[in-house]
Every structure is written in C-alpha cells, then in structure tokens.
C-alpha cells in the first residue's frame, strides 16, 4: 500500500477551504513570511500587517483554496484577535529562533490564549514556526520538542527563514496539511499508537475489503483496495515489499501470503509515524469518514428523490451485491445465517440493526436462522418501508465502494406513479403491499406467518415479544417472481390515512366468532368501497365449526353485492406448510387492480395464475439448489 497518485477527492470528502492564522510576538517576522511566500523574495519594506492572502485551489497541492491571515498587535484589538482565532482552521505560532522571549511566550501566552477561545473537544491544530534561522548557527528544536510533547494539539514544528526563503512553502503546506490531514484524531503521540476511533474505522475498512472473509487481504483484494483509494494498482514486487515490511516487524502481520488485520493496522501506524498520515486520511475519506472519524451524512444518506405515489425497490445490481454479502458470511454453506454469522456480518455496523422480530418477518430454517431468501426479503422490506435506512445500511456494508458506484442511491429503483400503472393497466413494480385488517384474535398473525410457510404448530413457538407486524416473501404469479409484503393493521374504530395506503387489502374474519365479520364490513364501507384498491375477504380458522355472522347479510352475499371475489376459506392448522393460494390471489389482485370483478370470480383466471406459480416455484427451487451447489 503506497500513496501513488491520489484519487481526486469529492467536495464532501474534506473542507472546502483552509484558513491559516499567523500569531506571535511583535517583530518575529510573521508579515515577512507571508510576503516572502507571495513574492518569492524577501521584502525590503515590511508593512505592520499583511492583507489577507487567498491562494487559489489550482496552485495548492491539495487543490483547496487557502486563506492566509496576518495578526498585528499594533493594529488589531484583542476582540479582533479572538474573532480571527474563532475563524481559523489552523494557527501558526511564530517565534524568532534568536529571541528567547518570543519562545517563552509560545507557552506563557499564545497556547493558553488559543485554547481558551476554542472548544476543548475540537482543539485547533497548531504549527510552531521558528523564523530567522539565518541569524543563528544552532537549532531551537531542543527547546521546542518538550513543548510539542506537552501539547498534543501541536502538529509539527518548522524552522524557516523569510530572508533566505528557507522552508517557506513547506511551512504553509504543513499548515494546510494539519487541517486536511490532522494527526490528532488518528494517533496518540504519548502512547505511540493509533487512537481507538481510528482503529475502529480501519477495522471496518479491512472487513469490507476482505471480500472472501478469510481474515486476510490477498493480492487481488490489496490491489482492488489500492485502486479504489489511490487510482493506481500495485506491481507484484511492490506488494511483496509491503508484506516484507510487515513481516519484519510483526510475526502475525502476514498469513497465507495475505495481510492480516494486525498487519493492516501496523502499516497505517507506520504511515502516521513517518508523517504520511495523508495516506491514511485518503483511505478513511474514501470509505466515508469525516475529520471526527464518523461516517458523513453525505456518504450514508445520498440524495434520492421520491415523488408522491412512488415506491422504492432494490435493483438487480443491489440484489447481486446482497447475494455476495450473504455468501461471504455463510461460512458453513448451509444457506442460512447463524447468530454468529449474522453478528460477523454486522461488525461493520455501529449497532445491530435487526431485532428478534426479523426472524418472524422473513423465512428461516428449522433452527430459526434467516435463510438466503429471508435475507433478501428483509432487505426488500427495508427498502420499501424506509429507504433512507436501507441507504444507511448499504453504506455500512461499503456498497458504493465495492461496486464502484457514485453512492448507494444507484442500488435503488424508484417506481413510477401508481396512477400511471392504473392508466396503462400494467405495472413494473416487484413489491406489493397488502394491509391485513380484522379484529384482534381473528387470525391475522396466522395469515402473516403462513406466508412464511409456518403452520399453527410452528406459530405457537413464537414469543409475544418477538412477534412482527410484517411478513414478506416471494410469490409467483404468471411465472413472475414478486414480493408480497403483509402488514398487520391493529384494530381501531377508524383507520388512519397511512393505514389505507396499500396495493391490496386482506379483510380477515374468524368463522368461529359471530361478531368478527361486522368489523370487516364496516372498515370496507368506510375506507375501501369507493377506492380503486382491490379487496379480498378471508374466512380464517376454516378447519373449525363455522357460526353465523351477526351482520345484515352473509359474507358470501356481501361479496356478491360489492362485486368482490367470494370469501376465501383459510386455515394454518395443517400438518405441512399452509396453502399459498390466498397469497397468489392477493398478489395477482395487486398486480392487476384494473381486472374486472367478473374475472376475479372466474376460476379459470385463478387457475392460470396458480399454475404459473406452481411451475415457477418448482423451477425456481431447482435453480436455487443448483446455485447452492455452485456456492
């Protein structure tokens, strides 16, 4: 890993400009330093104070505009000094190497004054500048080094001469570097080691870059890392040289010809100790970090415009990325993520994003572990319900870096307005939301869990505090794989506007409860009778004795009157997985809301949809097993 040609940083990667303030005792040469930099010669006549100088971005090494500000005690008040300190990004404290009084004032006046005027948690970086080195034969470093060790905010010390133009450009480069690539957040000089926040950030970067999850960065992974950070690959000999440096200092820094996490952290410690912390900062910023080593909002939440009546879905590239993420962490190749494997996956997150309810929202295996299909389903649900959170999660996984896209927004498809779908009588959507409505205890949970293939026996094992109000799984309609998202709507007198927004409604009543259907009928009349949202009535617990419903007309007559499909008998009290017929019907109705009620009542219509579902479920399963064998 070497710096090479640095990737052009985005505007959000670092500060938009740098403001350098020069302070110090009178006549130490502050103004001369600025004028020597600008004119490239020592000024014969020096004014009391130089005007503010702006160096354009195109002539600075870091391509950032730089403002240089002079301070004159004779011309400016204390209030003006305090204001300049508050506006500065870095402060150069200038002393004359031949003037002990000016050196003493560095610690007795200037550092305390600056620290009083800045926030304790975000101290300004300081540069100590020993001017007039042309007047002495000795160095002031022996005097200055103890000061540097005492104050961690001091980035570096530079001895220079405005008269001989010695180290003038270097001085301002170091000042600029102290702002854009500060040492403070990365390294603790007293302990001679990286700070915990830096180790944490670099560990996440290592985990993302270790694409086969074997605990080392092999040559291909190192080359990819080098290219995305520095826009240049490493020659085979250069790669070997890097590993040899690590081997020389660490017995466990290289394993199986790959760089271990310890070796990776050691390399960055070495960069920082050798004054090459811009290399580490380039890596950190490429992976989304700001100066405080937090992931930036611009990185986690890229701009994504979502017009009204549009939904959000993952596109093909996002699913490929998530499939590779699953494969990376499914170490035992059982097509499910164990708690330890899931924990390993979420190590690049600042928190565990999924609670125990997720295991009852998507498909799991017999041990309750999220399956391959369940994993993709949960991401589909998050994208649909809370796309900002999806962008955040993809950011933690390094989506834009590993796929070499501008941002996570490239993983999202924003569907067209639903009104256009209705006009054109076709939809391009792949995710359909079904609100499941009914009184408490009518069997809504049974409907949701049946979508995941769980019968009543399996449902009884679910703890109350682990229950989910959502369930999502794939459903095949006319040979097309779609996601059906069920949402259990709590019983209430009236539904909120948000509770009426969906693609299809499933009205559930309990055949053993005579008062159950009344609620379904009332909610239908209040909210859906005059809407264009298709509705399906489900007669739950159909394996039990049916009682007459206390309503003016029977459920069957109600459906006939309102031109709805007849009530669908449903039970989850089965030996095997419950029937998926109602889910095919619900998805079909969501896909084709314009289809006439006569068609919906036609057995031929449902037969075509169900036949397609059966054939493609079998084909899909066969393809899935083939993929697993390859994996």
UniProtKB/Swiss-Prot annotation:
Recorded topology in the membrane: Single-pass type IV membrane protein
Reaction catalysis annotation: GTP + H2O = GDP + phosphate + H(+); ATP + H2O = ADP + phosphate + H(+); UTP + H2O = UDP + phosphate + H(+)
Occurrences of domain EF-hand (ranges): 197-232, 317-352
UniProt-annotated binding residues for GTP 2: 441-446, 460, 541, 543, 571-572
CDD domains reported for this sequence: Miro1, Miro2
A GO BP annotation: mitochondrial outer membrane permeabilization
Annotated TM spans: 606-628
Any one GO molecular function term: GTP binding
Signal peptide per UniProt: none
E.C. code: 3.6.5.-
Keyword Zinc-finger assigned: no
Listed InterPro entries: EF-hand-dom_pair (IPR011992), EF_Hand_1_Ca_BS (IPR018247), EF_hand_assoc_1 (IPR013566), EF_hand_assoc_2 (IPR013567), EF_hand_dom (IPR002048), Miro (IPR021181), Miro-EF-hand_domain (IPR052266), MIRO_dom (IPR020860)
Record: residues binding Ca(2+) 2: 330, 332, 334, 336, 341
Free-text comment on this protein's domains from its UniProt entry: The Miro 2 domain is necessary for efficient ubiquitination by PRKN.
Function: Atypical mitochondrial nucleoside-triphosphatase (NTPase) involved in mitochondrial trafficking. Probably involved in control of anterograde transport of mitochondria and their subcellular distribution. Promotes mitochondrial fission during high calcium conditions. Can hydrolyze GTP, ATP and UTP.
Name recorded for this polypeptide: Mitochondrial Rho GTPase 1
